[in-house]
Amino acid sequence: MVYRRTHQVVKRLAARRAAILAAAREAAAEAGMAGVQIAPVAVRANVAAGTVYRYFPSKADLVSELIAAVSRDELAAIRRAADAAPGPSSALAAAITTVAVHTLSQRKLAWGVLAEPVDVDVSASRLASRREIAGEIAARIDAAVRAGHLPAQDTALAATALLGALHEALVGPLAPHGFDNNRAKLRDAVQTVTLFALRAVGLVDARARGLVVQQTVLPAETLIGA
């Protein structure tokens, strides 16, 4: 007789997998990807190390899926914010602001997803993550161009440039410090990079400033893990 998993079994397996990923995410938020090790993650998830390997056959698999999961969450947040905006320019501003807030809210996790050196190959997952988010930003730039709010441009290249600038400024090696538990500095940083990005794609300065002021509302959870 062929064994068929019941609905409850499937739910239990999915919940266990989610718990392992959540534990890995907590570890990365605290210590970067260096903190994502099988045994400590198993302890956090309250499972045996062998159980982690059952779901993720190697550390590379675990870290790659963590990167993918974090990126999916960010992409969903970007789309929600942009879709709620009243027009294409404000949608672009909302998307950029969301990227900045997500990056600053958990800087160690963000750096781990983006570029922190790790002892396993996760380049494919990182590339897919960047490509998806850049594609979403490009779509928002393109919508603003088609509406006549921005000049014609290579939207894919512009989106890639904007993301590179934001990430380098907020979590790269030259990024300033002192954001922890300082909402004023967090807000200033988000406003600065968002204004820079909007100007860079050709939005008139007065309009760009107005959009930045409208968008920069930091949620309480922004400070978690900063």
Predicted region positions:
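Helix-turn-helix
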Residues: 19, 27-61, 65
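Generic hydrophobic, amphipathic alpha-helix propensity
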Residues: 13-25, 41, 66-70, 74, ...
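C-terminal peripheral helix-coil segments that are non-catalytic and often amphipathic
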Residues: 1-4, 135, 139-146, 171, ...
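Short, structured helix-loop boundary elements
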Residues: 10, 17-18, 38, 60, ...
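Hydrophobic alpha-helical connector segments
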Residues: 65, 76-108, 159-162, 187-190, ...
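Amphipathic alpha-helical packing segments from all-alpha helical-bundle domains
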Residues: 69-75, 121-147, 156-172, 188, ...
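Short coil/turn segments at alpha/beta junctions that flank glycine-rich nucleotide-binding fingerprints
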Residues: 30-34, 106, 147
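Short linear capping/connector segments at secondary-structure termini
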Residues: 112-120, 213-214
